[in-house]
């Protein structure tokens, strides 16, 4: 079913935001509904992908990875995905290979200690363009520091008008991370979704 959904996306106009049916079909085809991003968040991510220009970074991987990959397939945008779990990385890589998504750079990046928090170990040979959009779904909240490491480790790669999309901001831990980011850079956050389940974070 994923191949049929990918074919459906390939037939759409590049600047068209995916509709509710597109998102629903993708979620059903993905199947991992207990852990997958919510429909509202997926649609929000899709809208930002088609409206933005430049490189995209995703922290963590899953349904959002396939969504962004489908929307970027006919473009020359760099799309880098960081995944710490080797088993899950290999599983998703097989899916990407099956769908012919060679434009996605899926990186196995184990979590390492940065002093006070853990974050992905970035391969030295990885070349990263100026990042226009970040989809921040990882590392998991059980990781020391959660998703905090994004800003202190990646700030030099983020464009001045970069937008960071963070899921799960109905949880206190994620909101505290956004507050802590102000120590690295002035940021503004807008919570979105029926219960504020995700947020847009931009630089002041």
Question: What is the predicted role of each segment?
Answer:
Residues 18-51:
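Class I SAM-dependent methyltransferase Rossmann-like catalytic core
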Residues 52-62:
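Conserved class I S-adenosyl-L-methionine
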Residues 63-74:
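Conserved SAM-binding loop of SAM-dependent methyltransferases across substrates and taxa
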Residues 77-83:
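Conserved SAM-binding motif I beta-strand of class I
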Residues 89-90:
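Short alpha-helix immediately C-terminal to the canonical SAM-binding loop
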Residues 93-129:
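S-adenosyl-L-methionine
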Residues 114-152, 198:
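A conserved mid-domain beta-alpha-beta active-site/ligand-binding segment of alpha/beta enzyme cores
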Residues 139-204:
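C-terminal substrate-binding/active-site "lid" region of AdoMet-derived donor-dependent transferases
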């Amino acid at each position: 079913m994923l191949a049929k959904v990918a074919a459906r996306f390939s037939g759409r106009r590049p600047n068209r935001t995916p509709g509710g049916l597109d998102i629903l079909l993708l979620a059903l085809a993905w199947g991992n509904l207990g852990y997958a991003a919510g429909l509202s968040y997926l649609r929000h991510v899709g809208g930002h992908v088609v409206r933005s220009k430049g490189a995209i970074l995703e922290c963590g991987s899953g349904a959002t990875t396939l969504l962004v990959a489908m929307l970027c397939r006919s473009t020359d945008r760099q799309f880098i995905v960081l995944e710490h779990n080797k088993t899950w990385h290999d599983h998703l890589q097989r899916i990407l290979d099956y769908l012919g998504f060679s434009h996605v750079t899926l990186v196995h990046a184990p979590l390492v200690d940065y002093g006070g928090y853990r974050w992905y170990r970035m391969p030295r040979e990885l070349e990263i363009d100026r990042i226009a959009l970040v989809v921040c779904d990882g590392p998991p909240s059980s990781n020391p520091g959660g998703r905090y490491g994004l800003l202190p480790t990646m700030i030099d790669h983020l464009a001045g008008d970069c937008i960071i999309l963070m899921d799960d901001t109905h949880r206190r831990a994620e909101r505290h991370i956004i507050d802590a980011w102000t120590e690295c850079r002035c940021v503004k956050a807008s919570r979105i979704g029926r219960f504020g389940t995700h947020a847009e974070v931009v630089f002041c």
